[in-house]
UniProtKB/Swiss-Prot annotation:
Single Gene Ontology MF annotation: RNA binding
Pfam families: RRM_1 (PF00076)
Gene behind the chain: RBM18
Domain RRM residues, every copy: 25-106
Top-rank taxon: Eukaryota
Residue stretches in coiled coil: none
SMART domains (UniProt xref): RRM (SM00360)
Region feature Disordered, mapped onto this chain: 166-190
Alphabetical keyword list: RNA-binding
The protein's name in its UniProt record: Probable RNA-binding protein 18
GO cellular component entries: cytosol; intercellular bridge; nucleoplasm
Lineage, broadest ranks: Eukaryota, Metazoa, Chordata, Craniata, Vertebrata
Length: 190
């Protein structure tokens, strides 16, 4: 008996070698023609073995709501069935597009340091955006006041100290209208 050897296209061979790192038999099938139906794709996949799970994805919202996303996931019963599906389907024409079949892998969340850094204002007071120099001084003054209180508490540890005063916002005075409200300005815009 001679063992039958098949030569694989280089691309398919590299895809199959990635499968040794995979746990399970889940494939990603992409570049799907929008006209291909879930039923026809499932029938095509069942030719390669028993399909345990099949996820055909659709757009959930937006202008394309209800239309296929262009890819799906399939779980086969055995690894051999999944490998056979990769060999036969990768690069094959389905309607007007060539299918792309790969081993599915978990999406890795990458932390982007630049994207997630939040720039916080120097002070969270409402006046900080209009008067940055005043807010810098008020922060410095607050730090000095806290340091002085800590020093005083260190010198007299048995004394009772009043609770910190309620934080007061330095709200700029309300601007007064220089002209009366008029509806004529609104009518001219229409």
């Amino acid at each position: 008996m001679e063992a039958e050897t098949k030569t694989l296209p280089l691309e398919n061979a590299s895809i199959l070698s990635e499968g040794s790192l995979q746990e399970g038999h889940r494939l990603w099938i992409g570049n799907l023609d929008p006209k291909i139906t879930e039923y026809h794709l499932l029938k095509l996949l069942q030719k390669f073995g028993k399909v345990k799970q099949f996820d055909f994805l659709f757009h959930k919202s937006g202008a394309l709501e209800g239309q296929p996303r262009g890819y799906c996931f399939v779980n086969f019963e055995t690894k051999q069935e999944a490998e056979q599906a990769i060999q036969c389907l990768n690069g094959k024409l389905a309607l007007s597009k060539k299918l792309v079949v790969r081993w599915a892998h978990a999406q890795v969340k990458r932390y982007d340091h630049n994207k997630n850094d939040k720039i916080l204002p120097i002070s969270l007071e409402p006046s900080s955006s209009t008067e940055p120099t005043q807010s810098n001084l008020s922060v410095t003054a607050k730090i000095k006041a806290i340091e002085a209180k800590l020093k005083m508490m260190a010198e007299n540890p048995d004394a009772e100290y009043p609770a910190a005063p309620v934080y007061s916002y330095f709200k700029p005075p309300d601007k007064k209208r220089t002209t009366p409200y008029s509806r004529t300005a609104w009518k001219s815009r229409r």
